[in-house]
Amino acid sequence: MIAIERYQLIISKFRMWLFLGCSVEERHFKQPVLISVTFSYNEVPSACLSDKLSDACCYLEVTSLIEEIANTKPYALIEHLANELFDSLVISFGDKASKIDLEVEKERPPVPNLLNPIKFTISKELCPSPVLSA
């Protein structure tokens, strides 16, 4: 029997208030946005064995990075916000995970009768760099 192990660190529904919206009027007031990140691992993460924060994706560092990027400027679209967040997460934590998933939700878009948030997701499988032989 073959057993496939998968491990995940999930930071779910981190709420931020951001200047986000297509129109100047919509961006006038901060909008509630929920951000979720999942770090997936194909092998047991080092942090599971070592119990060292240096081997983990520290969720305080992850949420601090999200705050830093999201608060740098107003955004018109959640797609653009998500892409900027995702690029920064891959640069900062891509060496610690096999896959990163990001979900950005605009809780209260100005759409009549819409009961749930608008969501945009990005996902990337991170492959180790090939070893080049001489």
Swiss-Prot record:
Keyword flag RNA-binding: no
GO annotations of cellular component type: cytoplasm
Biological or metabolic pathway of the protein: Cofactor biosynthesis; tetrahydrofolate biosynthesis; 2-amino-4-hydroxy-6-hydroxymethyl-7,8-dihydropteridine diphosphate from 7,8-dihydroneopterin triphosphate: step 3/4
Matches recorded under CDD domains: DHNA_DHNTPE
Stored Pfam families: FolB
Keywords annotated in UniProt: Folate biosynthesis, Lyase
GO molecular function terms attached to this record: dihydroneopterin aldolase activity
GO biological process terms on file: folic acid biosynthetic process; tetrahydrofolate biosynthetic process
Keyword Lyase: yes
Residues that hold substrate according to the record: E26, Y59, I78, E79
InterPro entries: Dihydroneopterin_aldolase, FolB_dom, GTP-CH-I_C/QueF
PANTHER family: DIHYDRONEOPTERIN ALDOLASE 1-RELATED
Described purpose of this protein according to its UniProt entry: Catalyzes the conversion of 7,8-dihydroneopterin to 6-hydroxymethyl-7,8-dihydropterin.
Family label: Belongs to the DHNA family.
NCBIfam families in UniProt: folB (TIGR00525), folB_dom (TIGR00526)
Protein name: Probable dihydroneopterin aldolase
